[in-house]
Amino acid sequence: MVHPFNRIFGKSDKENIDTDEVEYSTDEVIQIKVDNIHPNRYQPRTIFQEEKIKELAQTIHTHGMIQPIVVRKLEDEDTYELIAGERRWRAVQHLGWEQVSAIIRDMTDTETASVALIENLQREELTVIEEAIAYSKLLELHSLTQEALAQRLGKNQSTVANKLRLLKLPEEVQTALLDKAISERHARALIKLKQEDQQIAVLHEILEKGLNVKQTEDRIAQINEPKEKKKPKPKFKGVNKDIRIAMNTIRQSLNMVSDTGVEVESDEKELDDYYQITIKIPKKNQ
């Protein structure tokens, strides 16, 4: 079975890194000291629920470990880094095991990181911030555009873009999102505020007053309203129907582009002999 890692990043059969095969490999299973294993430095998941680990530990205690963990050897003698199976490794630590069954794989940093990121994304157990970080790392590791990554992961480009935009928020907002103190929709609403101090101030209002998403959006609109009033769109009075249709079509197209996550800036002016629309699109998605 070809793992999505290979379909996504175009690995040949020779370079095949099939994480399903990794889990069920027929290669020799050896015993490695639990204390000699380090967690995957590229692991996007930052929160491991203690209760879930305890439940897994009880299952392993009762039935044994059915699947070995997968590791790669580090430069230090007898030291290994996890590739797959961190929850199982944490569970046997909880049980106080001295050794654990493992398979050793020879993988580069890029391969190790990609396997960890893809596996976690597919299991859909990440928080939105962890998911955003995973997308960001994959973009960097493989020099992909947001559109290319979205296509290879089978997701909408707007989904990837919207998640990545969350990483622009202040650390305090990201922490609140990571801790599930606010929802993703709350966080996406805060992006509409351009000043970091405003974002943090509204975050405090959300937490202190228990604002729902609609109340948060209304509060943000209230803050942005004075700025928006300074730049009213021309009404194009006295123009024929065809020109009005053309102008509205352009506006709708710009809204569609914005919905994909691309930050488009536009300015409309009515001059003596013509109407001018200036559009600015960043060369790189921020």
Curated annotation (Swiss-Prot):
It comes from the Bacteria. The keyword DNA-binding applies. Keywords: Cell cycle, Cell division, Cytoplasm, DNA-binding, Septation. SUPFAM superfamilies: KorB DNA-binding domain-like (SSF109709), ParB/Sulfiredoxin (SSF110849). Pfam families: HTH_ParB, ParBc. One of its GO terms (biological process) is positive regulation of sporulation resulting in formation of a cellular spore. It is found in: Cytoplasm, Nucleoid. The keyword DNA-binding applies. Its main location: cytoplasm. GO terms for molecular function: DNA binding. GO terms for cellular component: chromosome; cytoplasm; nucleoid. InterPro entries: Chromosome_partition/occlusion (IPR050336), HTH_ParB/Spo0J (IPR041468), Nucleoid_occlusion_protein (IPR023705), ParB/RepB/Spo0J (IPR004437), ParB/Sulfiredoxin_dom (IPR003115), ParB/Sulfiredoxin_sf (IPR036086). Effects nucleoid occlusion by binding relatively nonspecifically to DNA and preventing the assembly of the division machinery in the vicinity of the nucleoid, especially under conditions that disturb the cell cycle. It helps to coordinate cell division and chromosome segregation by preventing the formation of the Z ring through the nucleoid, which would cause chromosome breakage. Belongs to the ParB family. This is Nucleoid occlusion protein. The gene is noc.
